[in-house]
């Protein structure tokens, strides 16, 4: 948390002081994203919601106490007729005003369904925690990949700038020699064209850097107008390519998707038991302490008008018949559990395929890097030789252009190999559930 405050303070100071750029490390970017991104905040709040829901379920175990009061004004009293020796007499029955009030209490003693639902509530909280963990891992993966993408864009910009600088330098040399008549006009025009051809790649690479930085800032929840940059280069992370990965040692034990399926399966299994427990008798106790008062004058001040009464009892409820509702609910719960198990099997198969694909991509990227790295060394040497040959009049601009193209392709391939390895590795770590931060 202290590091997060320092990072945010650095960003604010950079904005207020008008600094050209504020540079972020990968660790700082992850800290900002995990604290500022709305997706993470929503996931954390969902945990609190489930915890409150769990508390609400547990409250069903405690006595329920209510206070009530009722006042009634009789508009037309009931009439009772009686026969006395052949004569019928009618009598008005009741009082003009009546009042009832007091306390009632009830508490479950034996309720198997309620007890089972408490376990479901606890599992629901665990599921919310696991979903929050999944959201954090998703964010770590997205931010890390976005960070690597910025580094790749900057590396590509560096390559194209070197190509442009080399073209400008060669053009200067050709121009000097053209002015003294030692090279043809064709060579001079060709060198000018090489400079002009190199410029669009630089502009496009610069635009790619800006766009990738915007994407990173969006993930971090930052103002898109804030001027930031990232620290380091792709080569700083290439040491990860030396790590050995064995498919037989990889498993899905910590995979967040599989953990969510496990929790959901437990919840559905509990739900099935709850539907079966609907046929189990329940026992509850209840009690009340009430007052009642009757009067025709609307006054209840006389203590004699108030009559208290109370009771306590035990209620036994035995389910006997409710149509086919309980049987249908049980069958529905069984089907839901079966469907989830089939989905789990399918997702597990897909995750294992993705795990193998990521591992193969990493291994291929290592081979591509080794090949491209060796090619860069040779291509640099070839370019230097072609320039020297042209300077002494034994080479041509075509040789320089060809060697420059070979060097450019080799450097881009090397950078792409590192980038592909890193993105495949972060995807594999996500599948394995190793992106804890």
Where are each of the predicted segments found?
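Bacterial Sec-dependent N-terminal signal peptides
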Residues: 1-30, 34, 436-437
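Periplasmic alpha-helical coiled-coil/stalk elements that build and connect Gram-negative outer-membrane
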Residues: 3, 138-252, 361, 365
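Acidic, low-complexity, intrinsically disordered peripheral segments
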Residues: 6, 66, 224, 413-437
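Bacterial Sec-pathway N-terminal export signals of envelope proteins
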Residues: 19-66, 70, 76, 224, ...
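Sec/SRP-type N-terminal targeting helices
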Residues: 41-45, 58-59, 109-136, 161, ...
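Outer-membrane beta-barrel architecture
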Residues: 55, 104, 271-274, 315-317
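Small/polar, glycine/serine/threonine/aspartate-rich low-complexity segments that form flexible
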Residues: 68-104, 232-241, 286-318
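A short glycine-centered flexible hinge/capping loop motif at secondary-structure junctions
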Residues: 178-182, 390-394, 431
């Amino acid at each position: 948390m202290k590091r997060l405050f320092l990072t945010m303070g650095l960003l604010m100071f950079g904005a207020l002081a008008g600094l050209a750029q504020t540079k972020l490390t990968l660790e700082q970017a992850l800290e900002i994203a995990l604290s500022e991104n709305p997706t993470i905040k929503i996931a954390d709040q969902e945990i609190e919601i489930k915890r409150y829901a769990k508390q609400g379920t547990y409250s069903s175990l405690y006595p329920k106490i209510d206070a009530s009061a009722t006042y009634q004004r009789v508009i037309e009293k009931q009439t009772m007729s009686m026969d006395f020796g052949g004569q019928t007499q009618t009598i008005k029955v009741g009082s003009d005003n009546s009042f009832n009030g007091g306390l009632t209490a009830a508490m479950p003693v034996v309720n198997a369904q309620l007890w089972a639902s408490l376990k479901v509530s606890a599992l629901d909280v665990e599921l919310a925690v696991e979903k929050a963990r999944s959201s954090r891992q998703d964010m770590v993966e997205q931010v890390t990949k976005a960070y690597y993408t910025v580094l790749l864009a900057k590396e590509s910009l560096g390559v194209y700038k070197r190509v442009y600088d080399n073209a400008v330098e060669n053009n200067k040399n050709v121009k000097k020699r053209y002015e003294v008549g030692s090279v043809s006009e064709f060579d001079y025009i060709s060198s000018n064209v090489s400079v002009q051809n190199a410029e669009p790649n630089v502009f496009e690479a610069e635009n790619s850097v800006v766009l990738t930085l915007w994407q990173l800032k969006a993930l971090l929840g930052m103002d898109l107008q804030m001027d930031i940059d990232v620290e380091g280069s792709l080569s700083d992370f290439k040491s990860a390519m030396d790590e050995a990965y064995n498919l037989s040692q990889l498993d899905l034990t910590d995979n967040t998707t599989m953990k969510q399926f496990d929790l959901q399966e437990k919840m559905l299994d509990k739900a099935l038991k709850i539907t079966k427990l609907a046929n189990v008798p329940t026992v509850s106790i209840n009690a009340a302490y009430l007052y009642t008062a009757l009067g025709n004058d609307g006054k209840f001040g006389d203590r004699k008008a108030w009559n208290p009464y109370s009771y306590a009892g035990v209620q036994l409820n035995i389910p006997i018949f409710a149509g086919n509702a309980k049987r249908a609910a049980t069958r529905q719960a069984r089907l839901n559990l079966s469907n989830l198990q089939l989905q789990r099997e399918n997702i597990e198969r897909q995750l294992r395929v993705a795990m193998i694909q990521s591992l193969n991509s990493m291994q291929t990227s290592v081979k591509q890097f080794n090949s491209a790295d060796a090619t860069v060394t040779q291509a640099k040497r070839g370019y230097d030789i072609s320039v020297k040959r042209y300077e002494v009049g034994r080479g041509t601009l075509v040789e320089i252009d060809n060697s420059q193209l070979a060097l450019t392709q080799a450097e881009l391939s090397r950078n792409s190999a590192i980038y592909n390895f890193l993105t495949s590795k972060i995807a594999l770590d996500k599948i394995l559930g190793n992106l804890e931060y």
